[in-house]
Amino acid sequence: MPTTQPRLNLESLYRPLWLTYGLVPLLAGLDKFFNLLTDWPKYLSPWMANLLPMSPQTFLYLVGIIEIAVGLMVLTRWPRLGAWIAAAWLVLIALNLATLGLFDIAVRDLAMAVGAYTLARLAEARQEAPAAAPASALRESRV
């Protein structure tokens, strides 16, 4: 007797990740200019700060611009590319945090990198969907 399995709607997985990895980098990037959420420079390891040709706060302004760009990429025409950048970026942030001994936050950022990777793969699956079918019609995952 054949078993029937419910079909997985990839769009239901894609949308929350798309929103998360669009808005979180955008808001975190904006906050690099205001330091409302936290004092961002304290998360920059001293050895890295010593390598910078600028002040840590100026460096974080550049980081903020990159994060804003990544968030906008995810939310607009380039979600796949933005998600890949976010995944790599989060791994680098986790490495920096680990050098500060902030392992709990580093592990969180590594988990977020896995989510960004998942978003990138889902975005690829959406791009591969037949042109005749709307993205919401994509129901099966490719492994």
Language-model segment annotations:
Residues 1-38, 50-69, 75-143:
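Extended, low-polarity transmembrane helix blocks
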Residues 39-47:
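Short Gly/aromatic-enriched secondary-structure transition segments
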